[in-house]
């Protein structure tokens, strides 16, 4: 059996957010949310909805040291919120995104050092997730259409194309 989720950010937009969540849950779907810092978490808990995923950080990025420190620090905050919501998955985007979904600090060329930093950051997040009983998911955002400058997107796609399938 499988379950489907609907992103509360994208549907019933004329309604207050908590009502969107109630409607989605009432239709039998799990709920995805994005910027939890702008939400009344206790009101979301009271909806009784099942949350499938949420954004797993507030600021920061995977590929530079300063951004990585910030990403891990805010991921710890996200884990605490996920626990309150019973949300098992937290999304990452490789970099902080603004309100339009664009990178706060666009990166158009990723160096080897940046990949190593991203690897170390993901390793730290994996440890955090394991301790907290949640899974961090790296979302491969579309750079060609609506998320240019996300540092991990292009390479992740090329890795997939280059894999040998047996």
What does each model-found stretch correspond to?
Residues 65-166:
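Active-site acidic/histidine proton-transfer and metal-coordination neighborhood
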Residues 1-88, 112-113, 119, 163:
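N-terminal pre-domain/capping segments
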């Amino acid at each position: 059996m499988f379950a489907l989720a609907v992103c509360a950010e994208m549907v019933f937009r004329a309604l207050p957010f908590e009502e969107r969540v109630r409607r989605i849950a009432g239709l039998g779907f799990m709920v995805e949310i994005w910027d939890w810092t702008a939400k009344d978490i206790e009101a979301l808990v009271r909806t009784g909805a099942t949350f499938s995923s949420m954004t797993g950080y507030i600021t920061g990025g995977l590929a530079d040291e300063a951004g990585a420190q910030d990403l891990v620090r805010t991921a710890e905050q996200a884990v605490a919120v996920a626990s309150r919501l019973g949300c098992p998955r937290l999304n990452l985007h490789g970099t902080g995104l603004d309100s339009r979904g664009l990178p706060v600090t666009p990166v158009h060329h990723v160096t080897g050092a940046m990949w190593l930093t991203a690897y170390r950051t993901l390793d730290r997040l994996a440890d955090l997730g394991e301790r907290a009983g949640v899974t961090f998911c790296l979302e491969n955002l579309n750079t060609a259409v609506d998320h240019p400058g996300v540092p991990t997107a292009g390479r992740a796609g090329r890795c997939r194309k280059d894999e040998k399938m047996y």
